[in-house]
Amino acid sequence: MKKTQQKEIENVTNITGVRQIELWRRDDLQHPRLDEVAEEVPVALVYNGISHVVMMASPKDLEYFALGFSLSEGIIESPRDIFGMDVVPSCNGLEVQIELSSRRFMGLKERRRALAGRTGCGVCGVEQLNDIGKPVQPLPFTQMFDLNKLDDALRHLNDFQPVGQLTGCTHAAAWMLPSGELVGGHEDVGRHVALDKLLGRRSQEGESWQQGAVLVSSRASYEMVQKSAMCGVEILFAVSAATTLAVEVAERCNLTLVGFCKPGRATVYTHPQRLSN
């Protein structure tokens, strides 16, 4: 390995979210070697002293994650509903301790009562089947997006995945300006968490959702669409495919959903009127 390449790897392994472990290659099972692996830790979101959910995530940018999750799951309406936040270690992972306004905490407790007695959670924040795909307020049609700008953005999405470049184990979510420039990207071992981090950061910074789109390196599931729409995102681009429920929810809430995004290629599932070529 060249010295410059070794230096680059050392720089990346010093960031949060990567750890070296001993492993063996198929062609040399007799001699172990060190390699970089993405960290995955349990992260509990604790609201006013009550644990609400535990998610598996990369251990960085957790304040953005907690804010984005709180917004995209409808726990809060704006960052002002959170009075304070601390990330603290626990016995088996990390806790994000969040201080909610009294009004929002009362609403959360009502939701938790409906969750009482369940032994598992397939979709976090959902109490009953009727809430799956429940439409959010329909999104406005405020912008046009030139699909020709997508190609350059796709080439640069990997720039927001330093851990992913080293380990091959993260998803990315980034905000794409109408010019095709990517800003405010985040990565995580979980695709939903990467998106929540992006939503949280832009909301914290007071950025508008009307001039641009979200680009994710993963498939577009129902939750990715629902989270985006809850925060006011009008256009969601995904590198992989969309699910049927994602398409149904996007159609109902007026979100433009585009999948199979590759240079020179894209599949538009819903509301193509926001797009030009």
Swiss-Prot record:
Stretches of the chain forming a coiled coil according to its record: none
Signal sequence bounds: none
Superkingdom, taxonomy of origin: Bacteria
InterPro entries: Cytidine_deaminase-like, FdhD
Residue positions of the active site: 121 (cysteine persulfide intermediate)
MF terms in GO: sulfur carrier activity; sulfurtransferase activity
Key words, A-Z: Cytoplasm, Molybdenum cofactor biosynthesis
Positions annotated to bind Mo-bis(molybdopterin guanine dinucleotide): 260-265
Location of the protein in the cell: Cytoplasm
Primary site of residence: cytoplasm
GO biological process: Mo-molybdopterin cofactor biosynthetic process
GO cellular component: cytoplasm
Gene3D superfamilies on file: 3.10.20.10, Cytidine Deaminase, domain 2
A Pfam family it matches: FdhD-NarQ
Role according to the record: Required for formate dehydrogenase (FDH) activity. Acts as a sulfur carrier protein that transfers sulfur from IscS to the molybdenum cofactor prior to its insertion into FDH.
Database matches in PANTHER family: FORMATE DEHYDROGENASE, SULFUR CARRIER PROTEIN FDHD
Family, similarity comment: Belongs to the FdhD family.
Name of the protein in its database record: Sulfur carrier protein FdhD
Organism: Escherichia coli O6:H1 (strain CFT073 / ATCC 700928 / UPEC)
Organism lineage string: Bacteria, Pseudomonadati, Pseudomonadota, Gammaproteobacteria, Enterobacterales
Gene it is expressed from: fdhD
